[in-house]
Amino acid sequence: MFAAVMTSLTLGGCASFSADGGMFAVQNQTGSVLNQDVVKIRSEDDAAAAQARVKTLLSKTMTADNAVQIALLNNRGLQAAYNELGISEAQMVEASLPPSPTISLAALAGTGIELERQIVSNVLALLTLRDRSEIAQDRFRAAQSRAVEATLKTAAEARRAYYRAVAAAQIVTFLEEARVSAEAVSELAKKLGETGALPKVEQAREHVFYAEVGGQLALARLKLRAEKEKLNRALGLWGDQTKYRLPASLLKLPATPKPGADIEARAVTSRADLEAARIELSALAKQYGLTHATRFIDVLNVSSLGRYERKSITDVSYSLNAGPPPTLVKTETPAKEITHRHGIDFEFQIPIYDFGEARTRLAEETYLQAVNRLIERAVNARSEAREAYTAYRASYDIARHFDKEILPLREFISQQELLAYNGMLSDLFSLLADARARITANVQAIEAKRDFWLATVDFQTAVSGGGSGGTAAPSAAMAGAGGG
């Protein structure tokens, strides 16, 4: 029995805390995807360094990469996820330690002194130490994968919020320019009406067009404020930090879209959430084996007993005194009697009513549940990768269609309508209808480009991990594009 215990202690060993708190694996896995610095803030110096870098990045015009880096340094939710990783490491180290023995001492006093000591050790915990340590190590590795997933998710949310905010700002800028033009035309119509050169109905059409553009601008400004607040939350910004500058427009479309070869295989092998699920499944398999092996014994304690007794006694002796007259002399001699006793005590549970079947069945069903969920996740990952790539390609084609076809045609139509109006070949109604259609087309073109960049983020997360935030349906940008 004791040989087995010593073997278990030797093989199990004791895990220790890593110097980086498990962050090296997180940094290594996310670095190849994000190309950004991933930092866990542990001290005031770390916090000061992170804030200094955030301040430097905020002093420049915001870019998508800078937004991601700021989020990785400044998002407290992400730091909380890294703290969860530290908790998992502490649990792993704790699971690798042998159980501490229980020591009890008892003392009785009377005619003597009686001392009793008892050392109780959980032998079952010692025998299963190595298995429990391996399970804890698997769960720590799963926690690392979850930290990778949290990092990728934070980066993806920052990119999405950035693209939405820039697109909203670009729409506001465009509508402000359109409003200035509409205001000038409205003032001109008013002056022409005062001279009688323009009928009142034509004046009203100019004025309502100006009012419509103003209403669109107000809604766009409201949306911009909302999108900037979402970006602030994603980046963890507040106070003066929110006074950053956004670029005037979204980036141009790439010359060619990314290929979609092997996206399903890449998703199944690369996604951090699937890796965490696989490691958790391994831990559950080991837990199931341990539960099955110990199903008959739930408690096994060994106690080392020792008792020390010291009693005060009196030795009595008698002697005969021969002197006349002869007398019997009684002699009392004080003495101490000391007794040492040693023993061993075994305590175990007799499985009269519970033969471990309930625990075994629970472990088995939990394991099978994890198997089915992992398979479901893998199937869903394949589908999500296909769906994300389809949306990516469709949004690219739609945004390119706006840039290459719709906007140039709208510009040509506007020029021809203006020439026809100046030559009195068309009326003001046709000119205003074309202006409305041109504004709509430009706004939709900006939204289509925004949807492409959002689809790019979704495609990346579908393959590498980080969750899905969803994008606007590509067809939404096309609605009404050909109208007018």
Task: Cite the ranges covered by each PLM segment.
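Short segments within alpha-helical structural elements
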Residues: 212-239, 407-465
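Membrane-embedded beta-strand positions in outer-membrane beta-barrel channels/transporters
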Residues: 116-118, 162, 264, 343-345, ...
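A glycine-/polar-enriched beta->alpha junction
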Residues: 73-80, 86-101, 117-135, 144-152, ...
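Periplasmic alpha-helical coiled-coil/stalk elements that build and connect Gram-negative outer-membrane
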Residues: 15, 145-268, 391, 395, ...
